[in-house]
């Protein structure tokens, strides 16, 4: 089954800030971060139930090579995946779902 992806503004902002940070560390590293992030989102789109639930309705997937998680909600009845956050693992976990 094909699921639609919706990426919330918060997640886009987090990706943009992280891309800039990594680009300052090494030219091209920011692009690699974005590539790995979208690779993770694509995997989520194919296998949305693969990752465990937390807080009753959210799931999270680790981004390869970077200390980030893609936090998402799977709306099974609508065949929709909503990316809530691209979350750095050093941050307070309570911040994952804040807007």
Residue ranges and their predicted role:
Residues 1-34:
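Arg/Lys-rich, positively charged N-terminal/basic patches that mediate binding to nucleic acids
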Residues 39, 46-77:
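Basic/aromatic recognition patch in beta-strand/loop cores that engages polyanionic ligands
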Residues 13, 17, 39-42, 46:
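Generic recognition of well-ordered alpha-helical segments
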Residues 22, 26, 48-51, 90:
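A general structural signal marking secondary-structure boundaries and capping sites
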Residues 69, 73-99:
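Enriched for short, Lys/Arg-rich terminal
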């Amino acid at each position: 089954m094909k699921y639609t992806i919706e990426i919330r503004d918060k997640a886009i902002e987090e990706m943009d800030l992280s891309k800039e940070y990594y680009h300052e560390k090494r030219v091209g590293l920011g692009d690699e971060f974005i590539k790995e992030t979208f690779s993770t989102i694509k995997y989520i789109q194919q296998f949305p139930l693969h990752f465990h639930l937390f807080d009753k309705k959210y799931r999270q997937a680790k981004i390869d090579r970077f200390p980030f998680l893609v936090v998402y909600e799977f709306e099974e009845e609508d065949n929709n995946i909503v990316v809530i956050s691209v979350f750095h693992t050093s941050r307070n976990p309570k911040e994952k779902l804040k807007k």
